Amino acid sequence: MAKKNTRNTKGKIISAAWKLFYDQGYDDTTVDEIVEESGTSKGSFYHYFDGKDALLSSLSFLFDEKYEELKETLQGDDSAIDQLIYLNQELFLMIENSISVDLLARLFSSQLITRGDRHLLDQDRTYYKLLRKILQEGQQKGELRRDLSINEIIKTYAMLERGLMYDWCLCNGDYSLAQYAKRVLPMMLAVYKDCDA
């Protein structure tokens, strides 16, 4: 039960912070405003985070909350590739609608220069567990190639998604991330289809 409360408190802080970052900008958001918006205390904030900068690496937590919500809506009779495209579309729409390009760029920057954990690569994240489940089922159903390991497919798929987000940041959000991914992702994922299926 303590773990659930910990996740709830930390999650409230993260959700409030990213909402404020989006609404008023990262630089114009204070720790006091985050604490007030989250309905938590300053002590709780500093229990989980060294400061506001530490929240930059928490975006993966927000992504995983979205994946937790989405995994309940996945259709088991859809192909593995269709499920990946669905998850991608929903996450990229969330990014477009609630995370500024500047904040996403800061996340990538913080992950590149950190000496600590690189949360985006954490294999214990909901994201990686969900990918593994979808891809294993896809291989078992004969939808996906068997000459590639699940780990290889996960690594290249995650790299592809990060690359799409990174390019979107480089282009300063000049195009729809979700629409572009909707067009290119099926072509890129076709390489994983079992040609005999």
What do the predicted segments below correspond to?
Residues 1-24, 28-40, 54:
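Basic, helix-initiating cap at the start of DNA-binding domains
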Residues 39-49:
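Short hydrophobic/aromatic patch on the recognition helix
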